[in-house]
Amino acid sequence: MVDAEMAAFGAAAPFLRKSEKERLEAQTRPFDLKKDVFVPDDKEEFVKAKIVSREGGKVTAETENGKTVTVKEDQVMQQNPPKFDKIEDMAMLTFLHEPAVLYNLKERYASWMIYTYSGLFCVTVNPYKWLPVYNAEVVAAYRGKKRSEAPPHIFSISDNAYQYMLTDRENQSILITGESGAGKTVNTKRVIQYFAVIAAIGDRSKKDQTPGKGTLEDQIIQANPALEAFGNAKTVRNDNSSRFGKFIRIHFGATGKLASADIETYLLEKSRVIFQLKAERDYHIFYQILSNKKPELLDMLLITNNPYDYAFISQGETTVASIDDSEELMATDNAFDVLGFTSEEKNSMYKLTGAIMHFGNMKFKQKQREEQAEPDGTEEADKSAYLMGLNSADLLKGLCHPRVKVGNEYVTKGQNVQQVAYATGALAKAVYEKMFNWMVTRINATLETKQPRQYFIGVLDIAGFEIFDFNSFEQLCINFTNEKLQQFFNHHMFVLEQEEYKKEGIEWEFIDFGMDLQACIDLIEKPMGIMSILEEECMFPKATDMTFKAKLYDNHLGKSNNFQKPRNIKGKQEAHFSLIHYAGTVDYNILGWLQKNKDPLNETVVALYQKSSLKLLSNLFANYAGADAPVEKGKGKAKKGSSFQTVSALHRENLNKLMTNLRSTHPHFVRCIIPNETKSPGVIDNPLVMHQLRCNGVLEGIRICRKGFPNRILYGDFRQRYRILNPAAIPEGQFIDSRKGAEKLLSSLDIDHNQYKFGHTKVFFKAGLLGLLEEMRDERLSRIITRIQAQSRGVLSRMEYKKLLERRDSLLIIQWNIRAFMGVKNWPWMKLYFKIKPLLKSAETEKEMATMKEEFARIKEALEKSEARRKELEEKMVSLLQEKNDLQLQVQAEQDNLADAEERCDQLIKNKIQLEAKVKEMTERLEDEEEMNAELTAKKRKLEDECSELKRDIDDLELTLAKVEKEKHATENKVKNLTEEMAGLDEIIAKLTKEKKALQEAHQQALDDLQAEEDKVNTLTKAKVKLEQQVDDLEGSLEQEKKVRMDLERAKRKLEGDLKLTQESIMDLENDKQQLDERLKKKDFELNALNARIEDEQALGSQLQKKLKELQARIEELEEELEAERTARAKVEKLRSDLSRELEEISERLEEAGGATSVQIEMNKKREAEFQKMRRDLEEATLQHEATAAALRKKHADSVAELGEQIDNLQRVKQKLEKEKSEFKLELDDVTSNMEQIIKAKANLEKMCRTLEDQMNEHRSKAEETQRSVNDLTSQRAKLQTENGELSRQLDEKEALISQLTRGKLTYTQQLEDLKRQLEEEVKAKNALAHALQSARHDCDLLREQYEEETEAKAELQRVLSKANSEVAQWRTKYETDAIQRTEELEEAKKKLAQRLQDAEEAVEAVNAKCSSLEKTKHRLQNEIEDLMVDVERSNAAAAALDKKQRNFDKILAEWKQKYEESQSELESSQKEARSLSTELFKLKNAYEESLEHLETFKRENKNLQEEISDLTEQLGSSGKTIHELEKVRKQLEAEKLELQSALEEAEASLEHEEGKILRAQLEFNQIKAEIERKLAEKDEEMEQAKRNHLRVVDSLQTSLDAETRSRNEALRVKKKMEGDLNEMEIQLSHANRMAAEAQKQVKGLQSLLKDTQIQLDDAVRANDDLKENIAIVERRNNLLQAELEELRAVVEQTERSRKLAEQELIETSERVQLLHSQNTSLINQKKKMDADLSQLQTEVEEAVQECRNAEEKAKKAITDAAMMAEELKKEQDTSAHLERMKKNMEQTIKDLQHRLDEAEQIALKGGKKQLQKLEARVRELENELEAEQKRNAESVKGMRKSERRIKELTYQTEEDRKNLLRLQDLVDKLQLKVKAYKRQAEEAEEQANTNLSKFRKVQHELDEAEERADIAESQVNKLRAKSRDIGAKGLNEE
């Protein structure tokens, strides 16, 4: 196109195409095809360069900025010649590669040519400034132009789509895609502008404009400002970003006339309404309103012009430099006017917008001592409610106390502040979203015209791909949409294109461009994909975001390549998973996704919206159906289940519809590119642009355009259109197949035959060939038209010449005749001829003229008649045509309706079949449930009988228990006396022990003589012990190996996961390595220096490897030493356990000699067994730790080896080696410095572990013991309280009824309605509680199952423990004779035994005290229950009396009351069960959670200990201690051991002293507690007396009320007289009432049971006040009130006195209890501290012994020569002989002591021993019987409760099923009626259609006849006209 042709574009020409001069200058620049290349660059992707040299596959080049680089030869890419600079279609480039495309776009962008063709689609780059390329002049210039005839432009794409629509008769679509901020919205507006302008140009003559509205073209254009105001906002990338997607369809008629338009929107980002990031802002409309351009808006909306006054819209920026909000407001308002919005509609939209701003300012606070929220001021709520047409109080109530549907009923729910804030935001978002959707619907209604439409062009503008720092659910939906659109583009461009080639039989090799995105799409939308899992989680009530994350990981992590675990970086938002999209990897945060997907609303407020006086708001929510709303009837299929549709499901549905629309059209793609992130005009960020080009498939699209055949035409169309190029190839009149004709035609043309291919139905052309054929056709047509024009001009010239010749001949003849006439005109005979000739013909002429006149008149009349007839027929024909069209439309509509009715009928029939199947199934289930219900009813009756029997047994047992308690107290006193005697015997034993020591020293010399003889025996014994120990070790190691194997398997699975992560990291490192290799090759001149450094690092690496190997060898040596130490430790521990067992036997004998009771012996055994169990647990834990340490050492060795391999692999990288080296050094220093801290932490953790285990066992046992009794008592007390409250409420209601019955029938009716409403509410509450009970039972069953599993595991452990105990006993008996005991250990064991005996005695006393206190508590509670039952009976009697009075007034009211009481009793029973179950469930949950927490804590501590052990092992290996140092440590430890033993003895002595103090304090505490309980019982009696007094006061008040009612008439007469007296009395009475109320509140604080009575009294006083205000003042009433006042004063004084006494006693008692409690607490803390110190000392002693033994074993291993072994063996033999002699002496001593003890026992217990034994046996028998009976009773009660719960559940389920069955039956009946109605409608429609069809045929027949008659008449008229013209011509000729 030359410059003259470009002049048509006006000022836009320089921005579309450069001038010829500039193009010539660019083409003549210097260029060397061999040297000018592109080379890769780190920053700029590619740079231009010139080749300097080529050597060995490498190229050295100099870049434009003078930098010299060396790259591989395959990385060099050639530049295109200068004639291709700034080429308009990049598919025409000679060298097509990434840098060529990049630089072409960059150079065109630098010249502000932002549009460029890229094969079949267009690429546009955002200029970030205004360019004059969109005015009307440019639109006109592009109209009707082919793509090749004009520069690239969005108008060209639009015009081509328009022309394709007209020529191909196919719908078109223009897909404008790109990232956010790339310019999609602007290009969409230009496309719409183009279509509106060309339609206006083509139809300017037929414009009709509705008054008050614009034309259709103006309306289409003005829809954009309205949509942008409410749907666009500022984001980080874009100042005017569309936060919704839209698909605009512009409909055209068959001739291309603009017919109508409609808009579909997708996924409005409604979260922006209430939240924005710092660099962003809310939607434009908020700031437009606040711009103060229209002040009346601010007044109407009650707002200011400061955005920071409103929280919702001021979280980010409030102004945008590139947007003038005031001007935009006027544009928006004007757009509403053009679109035909009424002023009411506009104001309603503004009001809702203002209300949303006020919504954000509403504040709420938490009520004191409650979790519920309440309004913190109502000003903003008042404004919002006013603007929305609501009641402010109702709005606040709905927000703070919404009504929630539970089952079939509604209950009021309290909300906390956070919940109210969330609900407020959700409502604001919902209002805005629905208002936006309404606006779009309203615009569509305006754009909808009645004009016929044939085709449409759709323009898609949807949110671009988004990658933010914080990506949430909205970003996933947007990115998923872009993924689908990109897949559509790829499928259309690459897959469908190549499939078309194969389908048409063209030789083609399928090219895989690697652009398939289906994997990512399937990951999101397929079943078990992200969307599916999200919707599934939304259906579960207890699902959270974390469960959603866990499911995602379980289903996709490691299974899908597109799903990854994100790498969280400090300072950035947390991410939970990553998806690999086509545009990059996006990290998503899933917090709040479930709420966003469910999108719940406060249905109470929504109900207010539906009743709003603001018409728009009520319309927005008119069709809203909540999650629990029933399906509306008669709405058809579309409405069913719509209320349960999630946001993701709705988005997928809309997206699928969009994709279906796009697939049905011919798409045109426009790719928008964002040039930089800073919005700078003219700046290209090369890496950013290249990333977009690669992702968008631009290069691949160009390649397939060049390689493939983008243009194709059907053979018939091609033959018809291009036959003109060579007509001889296809002879006229001869039949030739279209394909053969096309082949002949193309073969005859002078074109490249490789540029086209023949398919089965089409001929395919390479890019550009079809344009060439079009040019040839245009040239051919030009030549043909030129020839036709020449021939036509020749014919016309010849015709003109012939006319000239004829005119000349005529003139000659006329001249000759005139000359002849002039010669004879004066001749006389000629004159005579002239006179006679006319006379001869005049008569004949006159006759002919008369005849002609008559004929003319007749023909004229006939003509007029025919003309009139013709007009009539034409009018009739027009009307008939109109009727015909109307009938056709009616027939079409009827056919559509009939088809819809048939579809609905089919669907209803299917639904009916399904419902019938469901009904049948439900009927069967109902029958089964009824059978089960009958069985359960029978079981229930049986259980009730058993329950009554058990209750009687319980009563008997309680009596027996009371007797046993008395005997138990007597026995306890005897036990105390025996304990004192035991203390005296202990002193005697101590003296005997000292004597024993003296004897041992005397026999020491004799024992030395026997040493030689026992050497052999000791040697054999050691060998035997060693072998047996090996057997034990092997068995233990076998079990340990099993455990280790399980641990290793778990570790293996964990390591496999770590291995995957490590492999990924290795891949990343390999990628980094490749990049580093490339950089090394580029930087060749640095290679020598790096090689030298690398060699140094390799040497360092080899040194490190050597060190690692040495450390590993040292670790192996230490492991061997550790193993030897373990065996030695096991031997010593075995010997120690044997000695302990021997000590236990001796202590048992001593205890029996001392006269200990059997109960004490059992307790001692139990304590000893627990001690042994704890010791074994400790040993097992130690072994496990050691095994874990070995596994960790192995793992550490493997990790060290892996690190060595990594060092070998990565030793070429200097920086990483130095970093790792420094890290290793730091870790080594940290381990060295923290070793002592780790050892201390290990000891503390072990101590904490044991303490926590003890506490857990104690808490669990206490919880199990007290749970049953506490639950029963609590439930009984709650039941009595609720019954008392119910009776009080009934009393109040009946008093109110008595006072209201005198007011008449209307008041009574109102009361009846109130009772009905209350009954309904109670039924609703009952149903709600039933649902809650059912869910609680389910949770309880789950927890019970878990508890049973824990119990089974505990039982299994106990069985293992018993088995181990039996084995221990066997070993003990086996080695009893060989055991050698040391004197010092016997002394220590004796002390410990005495200590344990004392502990056991104290524990027995504590347990007995606890039992006595519990019994007292039980008796006290039973007394309270009996008193309460008495009160209940009295209340019931009073209620019965009032009921009798009530029945006298009305029988109907009594019936309603009875029903209400029945429902109330059921409610109370269900509430009781719910409370008991909830408390049980809560305790079980707490216990289970605590056990889980302890377990997790132990696991973590175990893991930490394992890591510490591995670190210590490494430290031991690295430290390399020598044997000499270990020997020193052993000696030091032995010294420390002696010190610790002495300290331990002192601690034990102090502990005994402190425990004695604790025992005495506990006894004092029990006495004080008993005294307090006695005083509390006395206070309870006083409270009961006060309660009875108040009841009497209430009765007297009731009588006075009756008297006042009777005296009402008398009071009216003396009203004026007593007015003054009344005022005085009212003041006194109010003062007395206040005093009474204060006294009652104080009494209420002391006793909760008095609360109900005080409430009754307050109610009575208030009722009295109300009667005084309403009833006239009378003298008699004054007297009555005075009497009441005196009574009230007496009551107040009495209550005040009782209150003061109770308060004084309570204060004294509280002080004593607090003092004792503080003392007890301090003693308990001291005891705990002593226990902790003792356990710490024990652990330290054990650790010291263990370390000592380890050191000894290592020393033995280090000194392995035979001489030392012999010496050691001899010493051991000597020691063994010595100990054997000591054993014999000790046995003799023990016998003597036994004899003495027997004598002492006979002396001390001769008198009362037998009686004591009998009593103790009797006590044990009674206790066993009591325990058995209690267990049986508990089991039976538990079974009975379980059965009752099951019966109630089944009953409730049966009722629910019956209700559901009835509902389903009703639904089936209604559906059947609907089906019948639809059938009738279908039949009627069919009959009507047949009738209309017959009418249509009849009218068609008449129309045809009329047309025939009109044709006949017209032919006659034509004949008459012709005849008349002939007659007229003849007449003229004759004249």
Swiss-Prot record:
ATP binds at G178, E179, S180, G181, A182, G183, K184, T185. It holds the Pfam family Myosin_tail_1. Residues 781-810 form the IQ domain. GO terms for cellular component: cytoplasm; myofibril; myosin filament; myosin II complex; sarcomere. It is found in: Cytoplasm, Myofibril; Cytoplasm, Myofibril, Sarcomere. Residues 1915-1935 are annotated as: Disordered. The modification Phosphothreonine is found at T378, T1282, T1309, T1513. Residues 655-677, 757-771 are annotated as: Actin-binding. Keywords: Actin-binding, ATP-binding, Calmodulin-binding, Coiled coil, Cytoplasm, Methylation, Motor protein, Muscle protein, Myosin, Nucleotide-binding, Phosphoprotein, Thick filament. Residues 1923-1935 have a biased composition (Basic and acidic residues). The keyword Cell membrane does not apply. The modification Phosphotyrosine is found at Y1308. Residues 85-778 form the Myosin motor domain. Residues 839-1935 form a coiled coil. GO terms for molecular function: actin filament binding; ATP binding; calmodulin binding; microfilament motor activity. Limited proteolysis of myosin heavy chain produces 1 light meromyosin (LMM) and 1 heavy meromyosin (HMM). HMM can be further cleaved into 2 globular subfragments (S1) and 1 rod-shaped subfragment (S2). The rodlike tail sequence is highly repetitive, showing cycles of a 28-residue repeat pattern composed of 4 heptapeptides, characteristic for alpha-helical coiled coils. Four skip residues (Skip1: Thr-1188, Skip2: Glu-1385, Skip3: Glu-1582 and Skip4: Gly-1807) introduce discontinuities in the coiled-coil heptad repeats. Muscle myosin is a hexameric protein that consists of 2 heavy chain subunits (MHC), 2 alkali light chain subunits (MLC) and 2 regulatory light chain subunits (MLC-2). Interacts with ECPAS. Interacts (via C-terminus) with LRRC39. Myosins are actin-based motor molecules with ATPase activity essential for muscle contraction. Forms regular bipolar thick filaments that, together with actin thin filaments, constitute the fundamental contractile unit of skeletal and cardiac muscle. The cardiac alpha isoform is a 'fast' ATPase myosin, while the beta isoform is a 'slow' ATPase. This is Myosin-7. It comes from Canis lupus familiaris.
